[in-house]
Amino acid sequence: MATSCNLADRQCTPCEGGIAPLENSVAAVMLDTLPGWTLDGQRLDKTYVFRNHYEAMAFVNAIAWVSHRENHHPELIVGYKDVRVRYWTHAIGGLSENDFICAAKLEKLLEI
């Protein structure tokens, strides 16, 4: 079974379509390793709340770094002190392991 720790240690694999989205049962098992994340249809979703705008924007920049390294990019909705992150794999119209890998990497960033 995947844990958040070992998901964060994995690398995303390029996905250009041609595979099926994760089955709901597999996505549910992976979701259990990611505290605070929810499934919103075929999207992985979490809102992070920070003490101020500076911290929220610093986190957005950290997300950009992870996204660039993994070549897997979330939808971001940025508020004054909050950042909503939504992952899904556009090429397959649903969830892939890449979504969970990136979510786990974001969780690891905040383990301070």
From Swiss-Prot:
According to its UniProt entry, the protein's GO biological process terms are: tetrahydrobiopterin biosynthetic process
CDD domains according to UniProt: PCD_DCoH_subfamily_a (cd00913)
Is Nuclease one of the keywords UniProt gives this record? Answer: no
Pfam families attached to this UniProt entry: Pterin_4a
The leader peptide range reads none
What is the top EC class of this enzyme, as a single word? Answer: lyase
Identification of the protein by name: Putative pterin-4-alpha-carbinolamine dehydratase
Q: Which organism is it from?
A: Dechloromonas aromatica (strain RCB)
Question: What's the source species' lineage?
Answer: Bacteria, Pseudomonadati, Pseudomonadota, Betaproteobacteria, Rhodocyclales
